[in-house]
Structure formats: structure tokens, C-alpha cells
């Protein structure tokens, strides 16, 4: 708490007025950050964009978020603040799943995603794959950023769900 108090220009005693301990501080910061992230996502969804454009807009939010994450974020949170990690992980996967399933259903209805895909299964797989972005061990042999890994994940996901019309639409948007 010393380093946090110093950066904020206040005493530790003042910090303890607002936060019970470091775990409480981390939990509240994570919770607040997740609320902001969910609001950003809901703002994109409220625009009622084409399903492919929606995914690309959400992708921009995710990449900007990933650019602010230190490479050890997930590891440190899991190791030192397991309660905060559990809340973050559960909420993130739940949000990803819910947004994905709605997007897939709209995309199938709109005729840009393959009719034969199962939105529940694809959404579950996707929500679990997003966690892979933070897996430093999986990518330690190559030098890539979180955002590069996420871009490839989205591209792989998109090309797996779109039909021919959706593919043309997606590739055309990629050129812009």
C-alpha cells in the first residue's frame, strides 16, 4: 500500500479509510474496470451494427484494453489475488459468451454466418479461447503482443463462422 499511497500523494492511513486492505483495493479496481468494459460493450451493441461490424468494433475495444495490460497481469492476479481473478475470469467469460451468442444468432438470421453452426457451442468455445490470449507460456517461443494474438484469434473465429456472403463482407471491411 506504500507505493500506491505515494503515487496518489496521500498517506497509507488515508487509503485504509477507503480500502480494508490491498485485496479489497484490487477487487474494487477489477470490479470497476469490468463495469466500464461492459458499458463500452453495451454501447457498441446498442448501435445495432451489422453483426460482422459489431464484432470488429468490439475487437477494437478489446485490443485497446489489451494494450493497457501488463504481460504478467493474469499470472499476478491468479497468484496473489485469487478471489479477484475468479470474479474477473467468470465475469469476462460470461460477458463474452452472452455477447457472442447474441451476435451469432443475429448473424445467422441476417444471412452472413453459416446456418449450421451451433451458437451455444461456438460461443462457449470462443469465451474459453479468449483466455488463451493471456497464456504467456503458450506464446513464449515467439515474440508477439496480446493484441496480435487477439487479432489472429478474431480472424480465425470470423473465418470459421461466416458463409460466403459474410466472408466477402468481412474481407472487404478488413481492407478499410
Regions found by a protein language model. Name each.
Residues 44, 73-77, 137-140:
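Secondary-structure edge/capping motif, primarily at the C-terminal ends of alpha-helices
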Residues 67-101, 108-112, 120-121:
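Short secondary-structure transition hinges
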Residues 1-24, 28:
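Helix-turn-helix
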Amino acid at each position: 500500500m506504500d507505493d500506491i499511497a505515494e503515487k496518489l500523494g496521500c498517506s497509507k492511513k488515508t487509503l485504509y479509510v477507503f480500502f480494508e486492505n490491498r485485496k479489497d483495493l484490487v477487487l474494487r479496481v477489477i470490479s470497476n474496470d469490468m463495469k466500464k468494459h461492459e458499458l463500452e460493450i453495451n454501447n457498441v451493441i446498442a448501435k445495432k451494427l451489422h453483426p460482422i461490424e459489431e464484432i470488429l468494433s468490439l475487437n477494437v475495444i478489446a485490443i485497446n484494453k489489451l494494450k493497457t495490460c501488463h504481460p504478467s497481469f493474469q499470472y499476478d492476479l491468479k497468484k496473489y489475488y485469487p478471489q479477484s481473478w475468479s470474479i474477473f475470469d467468470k465475469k469476462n467469460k460470461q460477458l463474452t459468451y452472452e455477447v457472442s451468442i447474441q451476435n451469432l444468432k443475429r448473424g445467422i438470421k441476417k444471412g452472413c454466418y453459416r446456418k449450421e453452426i451451433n451458437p451455444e457451442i461456438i460461443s462457449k468455445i470462443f469465451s474459453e479461447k479468449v483466455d488463451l490470449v493471456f497464456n504467456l507460456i503458450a506464446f513464449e517461443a515467439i515474440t508477439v503482443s496480446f493484441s496480435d494474438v487477439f487479432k489472429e484469434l478474431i480472424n480465425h473465429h470470423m473465418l470459421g463462422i461466416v458463409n460466403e456472403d459474410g466472408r466477402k463482407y468481412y474481407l472487404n471491411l478488413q481492407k478499410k
